[in-house]
Amino acid sequence: MKILAIGNSFSQDATRYLQEVSASAGEPLFVRNLYIGGCSLEMHANNIKSNEPAYQYQIDAVGVQKISIPEALKLEDWDYITVQQVSGRSGKPETYEPYMAFIIQTIRDACPKAEILLHRTWAYEIGSGHGNFPAYNRSQLEMYGAIVAATNEYAAKYKLRIIPVGDFIQLLRNTPPFDFKSGGMTLCRDNFHLSLDYGRYAAALCWFKFFTGRSAMDVTFVPENTYFSCTNAIKKAADLYL
């Protein structure tokens, strides 16, 4: 199974552990990420038009070459290709078009057998100083709700399935030990990107379950310097809610 993410640092977060997670469960996934930090749908569309080799072609969050989107689409026989809006605009549906239509048509023309998926990303951490947080009144719940509404709208419009990472992260934020508002650990490393341990692990498990349908308990891989109680809590939540 070959998966290409057309994204930014948030798809980098989500795919960092996905190959290791899936391989440890005996169902290895081939995963690549097209990375430009802070890349919006508008920028992706412009880069397609220019055929600019502006992207890091990443394996496990490490760039191995520079590439354009048209080149990447032809590089493998992709089974799935994911798209997403940049985080600050992810809950602003008016920012998706006309770029979403152009990107989807480009993918369908180049990879007619691939299923296009929409990656629902997460809201910023409570108290985040991100410059786009005021657009959501600095409210995590308002931002999360806006992301859900926008992604639902475009998933319905283009008949896309959603990878619900944003839902899973929000759910974990209301469970111990990740209830940050009550003194628990944050799932973010800088109040918006996912933490390098539990946040990225949770996202990888979400993608793993989406693509394989397998139990998270089949996964034996865990990131370094993590506590069993925490990784096990994420696995249990994944099986219960995803």
Predicted feature residues:
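Conserved SGNH/GDSL esterase-like catalytic core that processes O-acyl groups on lipids
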Residues: K2-L4, F10-E97
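Alpha-helix termini
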Residues: E20-V21, L172, A216, T226
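Conserved catalytic region of serine esterases and O-acyltransferases that act on ester linkages
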Residues: G184-L187, N191-L242
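Alpha-helical cap/lid subdomain in secreted, periplasmic
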Residues: I67-L196, K209, D218
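A structural signal for well-ordered alpha-helical scaffolds and beta->alpha junctions
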Residues: S11, T15, M100, Y144-V148, ...
